[in-house]
């Protein structure tokens, strides 16, 4: 028997145990425990229901095969088997995917950082276009996108912008967006009609509250300064902006988006908590630096995960060889086809690793 299926009965047993506990009035009266058990049961529900359906299909196949020796019932049994056997195979594939190890961060909100990189002003404008694309996708998913911090350029683009996206399973869908995004188009400032190539980089991190990871005050170094606007001019005479440094790792964040020092500090701590947690999750500085390099990117034109070709209305994801001739729709937030293909490719790779183990 496939080792994946050997563990399914354990999942069913645990699911039944959880439902018994949830029916206990004593547990129902403990809100925090009840919510934790409900969440665990909810995460198992699809797997259990699919497995029970699979078991029923196996039984139906066995019953139909028993009827093949009955001259009168054999034609109907064969007809049933023609339907049941493909259904069995489809359910087996579905169960293998459901039983893949879950990314513990998949249900988390995210912090996304977008930076204009190679290409000057045009790269900052493309960074703004990427933000609009993700904003529209978030709206279609009924998520909420809010800007944490931004540094505008004089042409109306972003040197860098950090946003928080909250909703259901945000990280699971957007974690593959990390990397360098290349655009090929004629800039608005181009008088000769020549196509230019520019790059913006995207970094995606799961959001970690301090309930997940505590930042010790003794490990923090903070500095308050005046908020600045585009071009570096001061727009606030009061020191409301904050810079936080996590001394053990050297990770630094600054926040000036809000009008008050308290709000800026709160946002800065959230961003810092995510970055520090991410750092320790990588085990050591070398792994962290390599991951950040591959996630956020250096901005070099040759380092890319996706190309957006405006003259040909084409978007290509180089990691999986996917090309779609509907860039206009993708930029309007219709990212589902790209994201679904990336998720399937990731699942396929994990299944191959599991089968080869």
From Swiss-Prot:
InterPro entries: PCRF, Pep_chain_release_fac_I, Pep_chain_release_fac_I_sf, Prokaryotic/Mito_RF, RF-1. The modification N5-methylglutamine is found at residue 233. It is found in: Cytoplasm. Methylated by PrmC. Methylation increases the termination efficiency of RF1. Transmembrane segments: none annotated. SMART domains: PCRF (SM00937). One of its GO terms (cellular component) is cytoplasm. It comes from the Bacteria. It holds the Pfam family PCRF. Gene3D superfamilies: 3.30.160.20, 3.30.70.1660, 6.10.140.1950. Disulfide bonds: none annotated. Keywords: Cytoplasm, Methylation, Protein biosynthesis. GO terms for molecular function: translation release factor activity, codon specific. Belongs to the prokaryotic/mitochondrial release factor family. PANTHER family: LD18447P. Peptide chain release factor 1 directs the termination of translation in response to the peptide chain termination codons UAG and UAA. NCBIfam families: prfA (TIGR00019), PRK00591.1 (NF001859). This is Peptide chain release factor 1. It comes from Leuconostoc citreum (strain KM20).
């Amino acid at each position: 028997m496939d080792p994946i299926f050997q563990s399914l009965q354990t999942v069913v047993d645990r699911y039944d145990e959880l439902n018994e506990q949830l029916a206990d009035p004593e547990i129902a009266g403990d809100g925090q425990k009840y919510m934790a058990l409900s969440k665990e049961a909810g995460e198992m529900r699809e797997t259990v229901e699919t497995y029970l359906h699979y078991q029923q299909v196996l039984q139906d196949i066995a019953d139909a095969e028993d009827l093949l020796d009955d001259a009168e019932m054999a034609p109907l049994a064969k007809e049933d088997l023609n339907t049941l056997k493909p259904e069995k195979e489809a359910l087996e594939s579905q169960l293998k995917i459901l039983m893949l190890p879950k990314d513990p961060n998949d249900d988390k909100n995210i912090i996304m950082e977008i930076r204009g990189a190679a290409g000057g002003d045009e790269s900052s404008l493309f960074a703004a276009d990427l933000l609009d694309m993700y904003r529209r996708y978030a709206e279609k998913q009924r998520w909420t996108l809010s800007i944490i911090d931004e540094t505008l350029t004089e042409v109306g683009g972003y040197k860098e912008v950090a946003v928080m996206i909250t909703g259901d399973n945000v990280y699971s869908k957007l974690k593959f967006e990390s990397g360098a995004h290349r655009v090929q188009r004629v800039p608005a400032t181009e008088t000769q009609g020549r196509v230019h190539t520019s790059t913006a980089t995207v970094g995606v991190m799961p959001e970690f509250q301090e309930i997940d990871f505590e930042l010790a005050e003794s490990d923090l170094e903070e500095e308050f300064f005046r908020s600045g606007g585009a071009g570096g001019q001061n727009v606030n005479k009061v020191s409301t902006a904050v810079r936080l440094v996590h001394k053990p790792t050297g990770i630094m964040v600054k926040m000036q988006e809000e009008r008050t020092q308290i709000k800026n500090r709160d946002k800065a701590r959230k961003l810092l908590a995510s970055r520090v947690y991410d750092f320790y999750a990588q085990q050591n500085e070398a792994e962290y630096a390599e991951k950040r390099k591959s996630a956020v990117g250096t901005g070099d034109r040759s380092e890319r995960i996706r190309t957006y070709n405006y003259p040909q209305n084409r978007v290509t994801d180089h990691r999986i060889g996917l090309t779609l001739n509907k860039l206009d729709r993708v930029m309007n937030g219709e990212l589902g086809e790209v994201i679904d293909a990336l998720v399937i490719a990731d699942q396929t790779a994990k299944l191959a690793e599991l089968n080869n183990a």
